[in-house]
């Protein structure tokens, strides 16, 4: 399967939609979706997704390089693998989304948005995961959704984990550290992200990986993501990651800043980095008569964005875990 990324960006369906290499069978399912099934029997299923936001290109380039290595036989495949480029039209245009933010739509929340290409795609991707995870009995299910952040960050690479009713598998968290993540953020409530969906509905060990800052195709320095790319290659091959490295700092979400009206003001400048700390009593945002104030001794901001639509999240506030 040559030129998967180029064909996806061009909106071209391949002439040949399935085939085999020495180590796996591959099948093109729809634009931006490729399934690889190892020739040997495995009990592990992995979803690797990127491009849910079309301006976040570094992870897409990373996935394209991993696919090339798989097809060239440089990496043996020891997982059932589903590769998803989430929003091909937005990727082609170089925009975050064409109509609405798809990463707020999963878990059926697409029904709450005006119908668009993104709502239809979110519905398709939900069905794809249903088919993929249920087709064969698998002991281990992982989903890694690769993103980049709009803003710079005090942690260049970090992970955001969905709410989960049972404790997290420490092996999974250790792998995230081996993949170069400097911090892990744990959600406490449900949400509409792709990883919330896979975790809640299929019991997958899921994480949104934030890898640097959003840049156009061709402008990414992929060397800064070498630890992540190497960890993914090792994972696909069924090998254990290298031991050692620094344990990621852990945070949990303690509050959400929501823009409720056009009067909303975020009391941070546009250069405020992710994980910037704020002391207790600091005014974070104002929306008419409503004020959002830091209530813990120290809280750290994540994803501050005053330009979201009314009713959507304009930021998260975090607390550092011991």
From Swiss-Prot:
Gene3D superfamilies: Zn peptidases. Coiled coil: none annotated. Binds 1 zinc ion per subunit. The active site is at 210. Its EC number is 3.5.1.96. GO terms for biological process: arginine catabolic process to glutamate; arginine catabolic process to succinate. It catalyses: N-succinyl-L-glutamate + H2O = L-glutamate + succinate. Zn(2+) binds at residues 53, 56, 147. Its cofactor is Zn(2+). Keywords: Arginine metabolism, Hydrolase, Metal-binding, Zinc. InterPro entries: AspA/AstE_fam, AstE_AspA_cat, Aste_AspA_hybrid_dom, SuccinylGlu_desuccinylase. Pathway: Amino-acid degradation; L-arginine degradation via AST pathway; L-glutamate and succinate from L-arginine: step 5/5. GO terms for molecular function: hydrolase activity, acting on ester bonds; succinylglutamate desuccinylase activity; zinc ion binding. NCBIfam families: arg_catab_astE, PRK05324.1. Belongs to the AspA/AstE family. Succinylglutamate desuccinylase subfamily. Transforms N(2)-succinylglutamate into succinate and glutamate. This is Succinylglutamate desuccinylase. It comes from Citrobacter koseri (strain ATCC BAA-895 / CDC 4225-83 / SGSC4696).
């Amino acid at each position: 399967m040559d030129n998967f990324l180029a064909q996806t960006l061009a909106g071209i369906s391949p002439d040949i939609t399935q085939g085999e290499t020495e180590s796996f069978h591959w099948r093109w399912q729809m634009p931006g979706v490729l399934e690889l099934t190892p020739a040997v029997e495995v009990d592990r299923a992995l979803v690797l997704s990127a491009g849910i936001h079309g301006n976040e290109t570094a992870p897409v380039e990373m996935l394209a390089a991993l696919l090339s290595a798989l097809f060239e036989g440089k990496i043996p495949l020891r997982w059932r693998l589903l590769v998803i480029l989430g929003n091909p039209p937005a990727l082609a245009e170089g925009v975050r989304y064409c109509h609405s933010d798809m990463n707020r739509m999963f878990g059926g929340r697409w029904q709450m948005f005006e119908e668009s290409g993104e709502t239809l795609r979110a519905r398709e991707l939900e069905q794809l995961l249903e088919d993929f995870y249920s087709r064969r009995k698998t002991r281990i299910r992982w989903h890694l959704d690769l993103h980049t952040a709009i803003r710079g960050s005090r942690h260049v690479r970090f992970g955001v984990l969905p709410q989960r009713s049972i404790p997290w598998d420490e092996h999974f968290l250790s792998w995230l550290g081996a993949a170069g993540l400097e911090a892990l953020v744990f959600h406490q409530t449900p949400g509409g992200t792709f990883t919330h969906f896979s975790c809640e509905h299929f019991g997958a060990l899921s994480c949104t990986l934030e890898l640097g800052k959003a840049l156009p195709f061709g402008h990414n320095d992929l060397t800064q993501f070498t630890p992540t790319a190497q960890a993914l290659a090792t994972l696909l091959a069924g090998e254990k990651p290298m031991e050692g490295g620094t344990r990621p700092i852990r945070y949990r979400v303690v509050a959400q800043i929501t823009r409720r009206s056009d009067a909303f003001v975020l009391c941070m400048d546009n250069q405020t980095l992710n994980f910037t700390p704020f002391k207790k009593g600091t005014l974070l945002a104002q929306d008419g008569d409503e004020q959002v104030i830091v209530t813990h001794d120290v809280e750290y901001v994540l994803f501050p964005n005053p330009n979201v639509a009314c009713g959507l999240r304009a930021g998260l506030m975090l607390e550092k875990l011991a």
